Amino acid sequence: ERAMQSRVERIVTIAYLSLVKIDRALSRNLADFEAYWVALQDIKALAFDHNLIIKEALVYIRQYVEINPSALFDLLPRKFTASQLRTLYELIYGKPIDVRNFHKKIAMMEYVVPLEEKQQGVAHRAARYYRFDKKIYNKVRR
């Protein structure tokens, strides 16, 4: 708030964009920097044009994923569930995806290989694991 009320005539903002694997923790304690993770929909008004910068970064990520869909799989664990992949799509595109249609879409992706292994120790029905096959992806995408 204080930054928004100041009478600064020029501000230069440098923004860095980084995508982080879902299952990885950051190496430093965010509390040391008074920083914390916030869901996109929960971001409040930021100083200067920082909300616009975040919106433009999200547009860039969406365009990048459209051109290079394999980038999504770099953000997932080596073996992942359909639910994890669907959640990632929903986060990036900001809207819910129909579960049945998404499973059909996965079935058509030759490079998303179903594994025999299923989740263990979960309270719900165990989900099948999948893996991304980069070789098949490269062959299919040519």
What label would you give each PLM region?
Residues 5, 43-46, 119:
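Alpha-helix initiation/capping motif
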Residues 2, 39-42, 50-52, 68, ...:
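Generic detector of short, locally flexible boundary/turn motifs and exposed helical patches
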Residues 1-11:
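Acidic pyrophosphate-coordinating catalytic loop
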Residues 67-142:
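Core RNA-modification/binding signature centered on pseudouridine synthases
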Residues 11-22, 26-63, 75-83, 102-110:
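NUDIX/MutT-family hydrolases
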Residues 2-3, 62-63, 113-115:
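Short secondary-structure boundary micro-motifs
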Residues 3-5, 24-26, 68-76:
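Short helix-to-loop capping/linker segments positioned immediately adjacent to catalytic or ligand/cofactor-binding
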